[in-house]
Amino acid sequence: MIKICFYCDSIFSVGGVQRILAVIAGAISAKHEVTILTLDKPEQEDLNMYELGQRNIRFRHISLPPIGKWEYLPCKTYSYLYKKRIIPQIPITSQWYGYSSFPHTQRKVLIGELNNENYDIIVGVHAFLSLQLASIRHRLKARRVVGWMHTSFNAFFNTPGFYLYEQKNQFRHEMTKLDGIIVLTNYDRELYERELNLFPIAIYNPLSLTPEGEGSPAYKRFLSVGRMSHLTKGFDILIEAFAIFARDNKEWTLEIVGEGPEKPALLKQIARHKLENRVTISPFTRQIQKHYASASVYIL
């Protein structure tokens, strides 16, 4: 039996990454010893989410300590110089940037937690935690340490001001320290190979829901689901498209299920187009299957 650890920022909250992690970890736990190490606080633990309580998964909580100002200031200064290319973004400076963005005080805690449990495989869930693991790979006992990407290449590296836009070279240099990288599509795999000279494997997300009911064109309803952030879904573009479509298709409606920082702007956009009676924003729910079953078209 292999001991596998998934290191994530959150599992006890609502989101697509959390749901996929729960499904994958649950399936693997049937034959192996699986631990999810999360930055969630212990009081956030809710085993009803994603049916986690029905799986043979162990949960551990880790709290990375705050950084004192005498450690924070030099790290912050170096990070600024690196990201603005005032210093060259070569392998050694990229390694130092990895240390400056994940200071020694926090690295020490994570190394101790992971090594004390003697895992065979450690998986960093998403880019930033994978980069943390890359910076300490040489100190970890695990046989394999893997980074699992949950956002597209273009969102990571080609979105100014967000994600890894100023860290492309750091990612290129640091991720070679890991024993593997997982991406979600073959299209992204090809981009990593061509632009970063990294060679990930592509593993598509599994079906994470059991279908209940059946949608029908007769409902004349579009459905889209996800976090309300321009970087991840682009619901603003969807609303603009629906506003055009709605001019000549009076019976159709649009429902968006989700929450996030873009919600107030989306509500204003809906009001600007006078679509309050045709576009609905619903909160995240654990009963999302009912929304799928009442829709005609799902917009990804």
Give residue ranges: language-model regions.
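Membrane-proximal helix-turn-helix segments that form the acceptor-binding/catalytic region
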Residues: 108-116, 149, 153, 162-181
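Conserved donor-binding/catalytic core segment of Leloir-type glycosyltransferases
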Residues: 5, 215-233, 239-242
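N-terminal strand-loop element at the rim of the active site
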Residues: 7-14, 32-96, 188, 193, ...
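Donor nucleotide-sugar binding/catalytic pocket of nucleotide-sugar-dependent glycosyltransferases
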Residues: 144-147, 153-154, 172-212
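A conserved mid-protein helix/loop that constitutes part of the nucleotide-sugar donor-binding site
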Residues: 15-23, 229-244, 261-267
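An aromatic- and histidine-rich active-site surface loop
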Residues: 95-109, 121-142
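Nucleotide-activated donor-binding/catalytic signature segment of Leloir-type glycosyltransferases, i.e.
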Residues: 54-61, 264-285
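Acidic donor-binding loop of glycosyltransferase active sites
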Residues: 293-300
